[in-house]
A protein has these predicted regions:
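Double-stranded beta-helix
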Residues: 2-10, 23, 88-119
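A short glycine-rich, His/Asp/Glu-containing loop-to-beta-strand
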Residues: 6-41, 47
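A cytosolic small-molecule/anion-sensing beta-strand core signal
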Residues: 26, 54-55, 70-71, 89
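Short, charged/polar surface micro-motifs in flexible loops or helix N-caps
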Residues: 27-29, 36-38, 55-59, 66, ...
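Short, conserved beta-strand element in jelly-roll/cupin
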Residues: 34-35, 44-61
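Short acidic-glycine-tyrosine-enriched beta hairpin
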Residues: 63-79
Length: 119
């Protein structure tokens, strides 16, 4: 295993809301994604989800509050909590998620990704 340069990996793709797998460890996957606009409200019944912002500002709308995640910060959405990521401008994130997680959780939408591309 060699080091992975996150910026070089981000340079390999342009599509939005379509996470790319860059690694796995201990039943977890490490994903990179570029976001812009609004995602769907969804939840992951059995998995927590970590959003780490590398570039930009991410808003995560919950049913009862709004979370703002700035560059260099992360937020963990607890399992079972409905959330909707929003990016007014392009945002680059790293996601740490269990391998069992489904992209749009309990919702099937046009943007749902069944299998993450490895880069």
């Amino acid at each position: 295993m060699s080091t992975i340069n996150i910026q070089e990996k981000f340079n390999l793709f342009d599509d939005l809301w379509s996470p790319k797998k860059v690694g796995e460890l201990n039943g977890q996957q490490i994903l990179l994604a570029k976001l812009k606009g609004e995602f769907v409200f969804h939840k992951h019944e059995f998995e927590d989800e970590l959003f780490m912002v590398i570039k930009g500002t991410l808003t995560i709308e919950l049913r009862d509050k709004i979370i703002t995640v700035e560059e260099g910060e992360f937020y963990i959405v607890p399992k079972g909590v409905a959330h909707k990521p929003i990016a007014k401008e392009e945002v680059h994130i790293v996601l740490f998620e269990p391998l069992s997680i489904k992209h749009t959780g309990d919702v099937i939408a046009d943007i749902t990704v069944e299998t993450y591309e490895e880069i």
